[in-house]
Amino acid sequence: MNTIALYLLTAVAEILGCYLPYLWLRQGASAWVLLPGALSLALFAWLLSLHPDASGRVYAAYGGVYIGVAVLWLWLVDGVRPSAWDLAGVGVAFGGMAIIVFQPR
């Protein structure tokens, strides 16, 4: 699996693992949503271990992908259209991620 796909899958696992307990705590969903939420967070932790680079660099670069996926989640799941400020923030985060990922080695 390529690095970007791994980052995307990791971000979805983390967001889903946090969103499901939110549904239980704030939206009155059944406590059963905590089980897939816990599994999703376990998957997130395991996926982080698959990243091929130094962990600090991986977490820093992954942060840019997480921000992008979170704004996409805002739009697709929460039904809130991202503002120009949201999109600018994603662009800045992706720029920072690109500096970290594509640095000369």
Swiss-Prot record:
Topological category with respect to the lipid bilayer: Multi-pass membrane protein
InterPro entries: UPF0060
Residues that span the membrane, as ranges: 4-24, 28-48, 60-80, 82-102
Pfam family of the protein (one): UPF0060
Location (main, coarse): membrane
Superkingdom assignment: Bacteria
Compartments, record wording: Cell inner membrane
GO cellular component, one term: plasma membrane
Annotated keywords: Cell inner membrane, Cell membrane, Membrane, Transmembrane, Transmembrane helix
HAMAP family, A to Z: UPF0060
Family of the protein in this entry: Belongs to the UPF0060 family.
Protein name: UPF0060 membrane protein Reut_B3679
Native source species: Cupriavidus pinatubonensis (strain JMP 134 / LMG 1197)
